[in-house]
Amino acid sequence: MLSCVAMTMMGKMDKAEKIRFLCEDETRVGLKTISGRKITAKGVKPIGQVQWKFQATYIYGVVEPKTGENFFYEFSHLNSQCFEIFLELVSQHFADSILIIQLDNGRFHKAKKLKIPNNIILMFQPPHCPESNPIEQIWQYIKRGLRWKLPASLDELRLLITARLAVMTNDIIASIVGRTHILEALSVVDI
């Protein structure tokens, strides 16, 4: 018996030639200082300036473990309306492909009124295991580059995030998210 994903894919195959596997997630990035390790002499506690501003923005993203191709977009909220818009943007960005997208079980991912584009199939990962989604390491990589930064406004933060994303080539992203077990599974099914 075919799985629901396989049956859905068969119904959509005539519209596109390429099937892609992507990983999707969202992260909040704000003006509150991201602290982290600093190099100091042995026994010397690191000191750094911090700010406690509680303004934030959300970055939605998809990455392809096989190639490192990606798409990121900023939204002011984390909700089903923004997620629906994001899916439409992803659908247009990868218009020539059927997209199987792995994502978590967030409520807004399963909203009843959510309209999913025709070339997208959502594949929900098991609950309470974010480590199974490799895009989580992309967020860590981005935030590591924002440690101890003190942007004065959200616009300044956006510039820092844009600069961080600009240096992340497809090769860098593939090296972060290209887990062996995922790549082997994709090669078995010829994706």
Where are the regions that the model predicts?
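RNase H-like polynucleotidyl transferase catalytic core
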Residues: K45-W52, N118-Q137
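A structural signal for short coil/turn segments at secondary-structure junctions
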Residues: A16-E17, F94-S97, N118
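Short beta-strand segments
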Residues: L22-E24, I100-L103, M123-P126
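Extended, low-complexity cationic-aromatic segments
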Residues: L2-E84, E88, E184, V188
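Short, aromatic/basic amphipathic alpha-helical patches
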Residues: A111-N119
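Acidic/histidine-rich, metal-coordinating catalytic segments
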Residues: S97-H109, N133
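Mobile genetic element proteins and their domesticated derivatives, centered on retroelements
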Residues: C23-D25, G61-V62, G68, L87, ...
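C-terminal anion-handling pockets and recognition modules
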Residues: E17-F21, E136-I191
